Amino acid sequence: MQFGVPLLVLCLALGSTEATISLKLVSRLYLPFDKLPVGGGAGGAGGAGGAGGGGGGGGGAGGRGGGGGGRGQTGGMYALNNGVAFKSAYDMDKQLAYVGGGQFVQIVDFSDVVQPKVVKQIATEGPVADIAECGDLVAFTQPGKPHFTDVGSLKIYEKYNPATMMMKELCSVEVGSQPIAVRFAQGCSLIIVANEGVMGENNYTKKYVNPEGTITTVRLAGSVSNGPSQQIVNTTFGAGGPMMTTPMAGFPRGTTWSPNAGAGGQGGQGQYPGQGGQGGQGGQGGQGQYPGQGGQGGQGGQGGQGGQGGYPGQGGQGGPGYYPGQGGQGGQGGQGGWGQGGGQGGQGGGNNPQYPMIPTTPLPGTICNGTSTMSYVVSQINFHKFNAPAEVQRLKALHVRQPYTGQLGDPGPHTFSRGLEPRHITLDQQEQIAYISLQENNAIAVVDLNNNTVIDILPMGVKNWKGLKIDASSADRGILFQTYDQLNSFPMPDAIETYYDAMGDLYVVTANEGAKPMMAQCSLEVCPGGPGEFEEVEIGEEFIVEELLPQPVIDSPLGQAMAEETQLGSSLFSMVDGINPAEPEFFNEVFMFGGRGISAYKVDPITMNMTLAWDSGDVIEKEIAKFFPKIFNGAAFSRPPQRVKPFMTKDSRSSGRGPECESLAVGDVQGRKLIFVGIDGVSALAIFSVAPGNSTPVYESLFKDGHIDASYNALYKNRKTGRVSGTVSMYEVIDVPYWMLLKTLGTNIEGSSAISMTSSAFSIFFAFLSGMFAIFMKM
């Protein structure tokens, strides 16, 4: 590896002959924060095959037959922590990543997985909050102007066309305040936006604004002008056949399947001496009767033969099922050229549902920019029905939070709906229902996408730490796990995803990061008579010193621990929850923020209610302590970067939310569902799996690469940092024998391989490229 340390992939104790799931770095590309480099990107990691050339600008030497590094970076500005790669989306068909940052959307070409390169930049005139792709479209959200509390926007673009090197803007749609998440659904015909509605003092209007948290749906119709894919695709669909009487494994109960398959596409022609053409995508499956499943997708075409010294063609992707048919088998890999073996088969079509593409007839709505054939209809979904006093009382009793109720003295209004802050979006398999996390509120909203209504708000409740280990103090200056049987915390999930088990039951997975405690300010000019600032947390010791809890609680083991700085005395507890209604200045109970792990909730298909089926407990924090003790509960980035080294931040987050499990990605590999968890604090990935026939996850390993032995600035200059620098990386998913992991760990016994990646959220996405299952992490 180019970082000078072995790959560390970590796992729980397994038998010596058993293997665990891990990651292996394939390539990493540093992105500029101002303009495209003139001389090409930094060289990537070497590939397999004959000897490749050396990489310029820090690129690694190619392996046998692998590509050399790119030309040196002769243009563009590169710097640490500049928000270059905040969110990303990946087009598997064209092998292009769309990476959104503070000033640009940058298009990265991964057709050469060893040596990716930036092929286009789109100036965005402001930061990109989130980005998604589907079909011929790319969509990203941006906060409002001139102030972040103003209405934000959704930008819809035609995808990058390699032939014209253009990416045309189609639509600009007003959404809600702080549009933090975007997701396509229903065959690219629907875009869902979560508008967080964060409050703040508007310096332009001289008002304190607490916008409504809302959800925007944008229904699309018409067509775009982008040319056809370079991949040869067979468009002959299989006819719908007789439906089976039992559902396919992994599909919802009560569904059936029409098994007819479409034909496979033809393989592309190899180009001497370059890479062979990609096999065509298999035909789309036939349509079954609703709610039956559509036909199985066709087998992907055979990849083209590689030229001398070139890469073999990738097998075609299996055709998608129709509604929601099983995906087709991946095509056979093409024959390799000199020095190469045959390419691996392409990805089989996913079991996710596929809808007809965007209707070709425009809707009676707004016509998009630059086209007379694309139109959209916007719907705004609010939470007003939950403002009824009975609803507020019901939800608060279930620990659905409303942290801010006017504590700064602003005129308001301070309705319950204004306190709700949607953050992340996931979907059921039919893409009829959206599940949207309300992190600050410790809840998940269930949204009917066909009727544009919120069905319910589901509470995430509390996590009790009885029997579990936790290091909840930064004052002990080290790793000190203790057990507090009376300690409770709010999970407060950030990212959420879904998966189906073999019985067809739906599970919602949550990354229980815990919300960042609110620290709000309002000038006396805008909030006359107010306190000027509001904080929703206080250290545990203050609850005891000020006698804010009932005497039995103060005398309990929990109260005694809260009196000790090295136990729970320096831990942060909520000042807006557990309040005594008869005496609001006192508390009946206390709660910390975050679950320090992930959870899986089983969804009732009739009531839509969720039941906790599994929680990761304390495994993530304990595994970080075991394998990365030097940066345990550390910070991903700290100032001043020219002096601070990553290991200096050790234990700094223990009093708060600990590891901060922030993001999620779920995928299928060789029959196993894999769950990747982005851990913000130490910038690592925890890997869990759900085996065929099982319903709940099992911990696999912990992954991290890089160094911690120099300042952040020095690590960046030596290309040994990750996400703080604004990079995009590809990792191969591999099985590693446990004995090999132990041997690898022996080369770095102090666990000093870790490196900061950034303080912002991970963005993880999956792709099948060059026969390998890869994880792309915006880093």
From Swiss-Prot:
Region annotation (Disordered) ranges: 249-363
Q: Name one GO cellular component term.
A: plasma membrane
Reply yes or no: does the keyword Membrane apply: yes
* A Pfam short name: choice_anch_I
Q: Where in the cell is it found?
A: Cell membrane
Q: What PANTHER family does the database record attribute to this sequence? A: MESENCHYME-SPECIFIC CELL SURFACE GLYCOPROTEIN
Which keywords are on file for this protein? Cell membrane, Glycoprotein, GPI-anchor, Lipoprotein, Membrane, Repeat, Signal
Report the membrane topology from the UniProt record. Lipid-anchor; GPI-anchor
According to its UniProt entry, what is the function of this protein? Not known. Could be involved in mesenchyme cell migration, adhesion, fusion, or spicule formation.
Tissue-specificity statement: Restricted to the primary mesenchyme cell lineage.
Q: Where is the composition biased (Gly residues)?
A: 262-351
Q: Which residues are glycosylated?
A: N203, N234, N369, N451, N609
**Would the keyword Signal be found if you checked this record's keyword annotation?**
yes
Q: What is this protein called?
A: Mesenchyme-specific cell surface glycoprotein
Signal sequence range: 1-15
**Matches recorded under InterPro entries:** Choice_anch_I, Mesenchyme-surface_protein
